[in-house]
């Protein structure tokens, strides 16, 4: 039995989905343990290109059981739409290969509405939300003002619980935002539609995971976003509202006593970021546009152009520490093939001094990048499958990053396809 977590080291969008898709051949169960429909995992396989927002990336592997844990913001509407899209491409989804925790809280119809209303209220001080209802959902969860998926199985208890929540939530909608209130009829129609559709998948996933572990099954925990978006350790308040770090995987999966044997941190060969907040090594103008086009850097959920720049050694080293990574997967190395020189943010300058630690969020905007560079390789490496077949300049770049961040780079991706990977 072996448990592994695949996590993001930076701002998210590092390529976690393709790594889960690759490694699931060695695992029996894949678990999503936090987040909701606010970020996408891109998977490219023989069935096409998919942007998964809620479904675990193991859904494409025959024989793999996929679990949505209690830490997930369960958006029934988006989940069902995503399921239908995947099914239409010939992928089977049944209660045998998809299990939803009865303790996962439901993202309710007003959560997305409140997200948009609050971003509009904040105007130029907005957080850059994807407007998928994530912050209002987690706020309500911790105020105990939402319902668990398991309550869908007990309608009388569900309606009693929702009545109290609805009265409280309408006060916020009407008095704070001047918005139209919701009704119980609205909620019952929503439950009759999307709630009924996911009911067959709801079960005690904690019991399932414990039994799988007892039987010697290998479990893979899949995170959303990355270290720098973690609610506690990220660039607060420009973070998500959950904990993408590996330490939360046992809690958010429904299997709190689980031990994680291997933590694969995913790092892009350059930096990208969606949303607001400090981004120390950001590029602008033509320089940014070339990298954005080369890497296809547009949000999987929103389609927004991602902010881009060179790899940030300081932020990456910090992200690795937050995750406790044992191995690194360096993705999209092939994207840098157009550059004569590969730029690297090696350190920061803060208060007139050069530093190699990640600053406290309040003073991070004052940090400036201290740059270095290495020779590029200027050739197509997308067909390379062996480490020794990479150009020397590409190997030198990978080895430099490895030394600077202090963690072994075990996997190097050179393309989006499942087999476009070099294992060192």
What do the predicted segments below correspond to?
Residues 1-424:
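Non-transmembrane, aqueous-exposed alpha-helical and coiled segments at domain scale
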């Amino acid at each position: 039995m072996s448990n592994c977590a695949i996590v993001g080291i930076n701002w998210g969008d590092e390529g976690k989905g393709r790594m889960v898709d690759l490694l699931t051949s060695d695992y029996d169960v894949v678990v999503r343990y936090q987040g909701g429909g606010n970020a996408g995992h891109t998977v490219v396989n023989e069935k096409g290109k998919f942007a998964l927002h809620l479904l675990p990336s193991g859904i494409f592997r025959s024989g793999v059981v996929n679990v949505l844990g209690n830490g997930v913001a369960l958006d029934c509407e988006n989940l069902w739409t995503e399921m239908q899209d995947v099914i239409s491409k010939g992928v089977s989804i049944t209660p045998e290969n998809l299990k939803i925790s009865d303790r996962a809280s439901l993202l309710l119809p007003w959560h997305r509405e409140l997200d948009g209303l609050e971003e509009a209220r904040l105007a130029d001080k907005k957080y850059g939300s994807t407007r998928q209802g994530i912050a209002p959902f987690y706020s309500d969860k911790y105020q105990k003002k939402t319902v668990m998926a398991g309550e869908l199985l007990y309608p009388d208890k569900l309606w009693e619980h929702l009545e109290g929540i609805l009265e409280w939530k309408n006060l916020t909608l009407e008095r704070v935002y001047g918005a139209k209130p919701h009704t119980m009829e609205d909620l019952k129609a929503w439950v009759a539609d999307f709630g009924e559709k996911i009911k067959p998948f709801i079960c005690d996933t904690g019991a399932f995971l414990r039994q799988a572990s007892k039987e010697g099954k290998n479990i893979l925990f899949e995170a959303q976003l990355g270290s720098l978006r973690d609610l506690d350790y990220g660039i607060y308040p420009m973070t998500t509202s959950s904990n993408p770090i590996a330490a939360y995987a046992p809690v958010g999966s429904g299997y709190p006593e689980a031990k994680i044997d291997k933590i694969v941190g995913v790092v892009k060969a350059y930096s990208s970021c969606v949303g607001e907040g400090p981004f120390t090594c950001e590029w602008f103008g033509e320089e940014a546009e070339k990298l954005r086009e080369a890497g296809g850097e547009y949000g999987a959920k929103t389609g927004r152009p991602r902010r881009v720049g060179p790899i940030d050694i300081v932020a990456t080293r910090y992200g690795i520490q937050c995750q406790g990574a044992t191995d690194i997967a360096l993705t999209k190395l092939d994207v840098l093939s157009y550059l004569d020189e590969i730029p690297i943010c090696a350190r920061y300058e803060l208060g007139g001094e050069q530093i190699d630690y990640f600053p406290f969020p309040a003073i991070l905007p004052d940090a400036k990048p201290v740059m270095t560079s290495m020779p590029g390789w200027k050739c197509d490496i997308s067909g390379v499958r062996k480490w020794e077949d990479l150009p020397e300049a590409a190997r030198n770049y990978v080895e430099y990053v490895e030394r600077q961040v202090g963690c072994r780079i075990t996997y190097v991706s050179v393309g989006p396809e499942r087999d476009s990977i070099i294992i060192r």
